A protein has these predicted regions:
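Short amphipathic alpha-helical interaction segments
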Residues: 63-79
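Short helix-capping/hinge SLiMs at alpha-helix to coil transitions
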Residues: 31-35, 46-51, 78
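Short, cationic-aromatic polyanion-contact patches
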Residues: 32-36, 84-110
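N-terminal acidic, proline/glycine-rich, low-complexity intrinsically disordered segments
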Residues: 1-9
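Short alpha-helical segments that sit at the start of domains
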Residues: 11-40
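Short, well-structured alpha-helical interface segments that form or flank functional binding sites
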Residues: 33-40, 53, 67-71
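Amphipathic alpha-helical dimerization/coiled-coil segments
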Residues: 104-133
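Short acidic, hydrophobic short linear motifs in intrinsically disordered regions
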Residues: 41, 51-61
Length: 133
């Protein structure tokens, strides 16, 4: 499984809102943003590209509990959205994937989320996914 395996929900495609061929963002959002914790992690890592953070630091920076974000970090690492590596002390640190396509789509997601109508569509999708479990 990777960051681009799930298709858009068919409702409110981002492509239709932007008119600029953002179907890859549709796929990425639908396949990866299953919670607002996932959203927060993605935005944090994209805004701090190249910076790695361990679980405790990330939780502190996001104002979330470690148990809230740990499963999201594991899922993102498994999908290739982020890279995880253990340091010499054994502490795992996370950074946005070095894959240029993942970085491009993450950057585009953050840009698009600044537009109210698009952000509301993203919120609707996350809520729908959360309600499905």
């Amino acid at each position: 499984m990777n960051a681009f395996t799930s298709g858009p929900s068919g409702e409110g495609r981002i492509d239709d809102l932007t008119g600029s061929g953002d179907s890859d963002v549709d796929v990425f959002v639908d396949g990866n943003l299953s919670s607002f914790a996932a959203w927060d992690i993605l935005v944090y890592l994209e805004n701090n590209a190249g910076v790695s953070a361990d679980l405790a630091e990330m939780a502190s920076r996001l104002g979330r509990k470690e148990h809230e974000i740990e499963p999201v970090l594991r899922d993102f690492a498994g999908r290739g959205v982020i890279a995880a590596s253990a340091g010499p002390d054994g502490v795992v640190c996370y950074v946005l994937s070095p894959d240029p396509e993942v970085r491009r789509v993450a950057t585009r997601f953050v840009e698009l989320a600044k537009v109210r109508e698009i952000r509301l569509e993203f919120v609707r999708r996350v809520l729908a996914r959360m309600s499905r479990g």
